[in-house]
């Protein structure tokens, strides 16, 4: 899942996708870009969100570290602090990794809040409507 609400938002998303393709793996599908209101905080800046499906041979934690590196390169300064969200140039979240379930301090798969966030589920359901959530056992389109 990708999101941005600062700067040239479309450019930020396209740059993130290009860097993901260069370092993580082949982007096999990319959703449309969705304009959405901020979630979890107030801002005058609307978000642009998208979902991408990437084929990779890398393990989940390597994907996480590479996407965090890409965020920093594009201009992300920090993730939420103490659960407080803020404006960001780019946010890249690893939502799913096949049907893998992972619960570590650094990474939880599937993303524990994805099904509660329409700005995540709408683009994800566009590119993978019949993909089944490995814990909830429902298709992405059913979770919308």
Give residue spans per PLM region:
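N-terminal beta1-alpha1 ligand-phosphate binding loop
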Residues: 1-24, 31-37
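Beta-strand scaffold of nucleotide-dependent catalytic cores
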Residues: 28-30, 105
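Short, charge-patterned binding micro-sites
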Residues: 31-57
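Flexible, gly/pro- and Lys/Arg-enriched active-site loops
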Residues: 39-46, 61-144
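Hydrophobic alpha-helical segments and helix-packing faces
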Residues: 6-9, 13, 23, 41, ...
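A structural signal for short, well-ordered beta-strand segments
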Residues: 2, 30, 50-52, 92-94
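Short beta-strand-to-loop capping motifs
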Residues: 4, 52-58, 96-98
């Amino acid at each position: 899942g990708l999101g941005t609400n600062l700067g040239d938002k479309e450019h930020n998303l396209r740059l993130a996708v290009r860097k993901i393709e260069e370092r993580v793996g082949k982007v096999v599908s990319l959703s449309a870009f969705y304009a959405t209101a901020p979630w979890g905080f107030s801002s005058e800046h609307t978000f642009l969100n998208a979902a991408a499906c990437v084929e990779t041979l890398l393990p989940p934690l390597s994907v996480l570290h590479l996407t965090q590196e890409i965020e920093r390169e594009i201009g992300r300064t920090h993730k939420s602090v103490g659960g407080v969200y803020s404006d960001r140039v780019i946010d890249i979240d690893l939502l799913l990794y096949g049907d893998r379930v992972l619960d570590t301090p650094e990474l939880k798969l599937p993303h524990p809040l994805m099904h509660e966030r329409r700005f995540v589920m709408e683009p994800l359901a566009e590119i993978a409507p019949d993909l089944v959530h490995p814990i909830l056992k429902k298709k992405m389109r059913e979770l919308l």
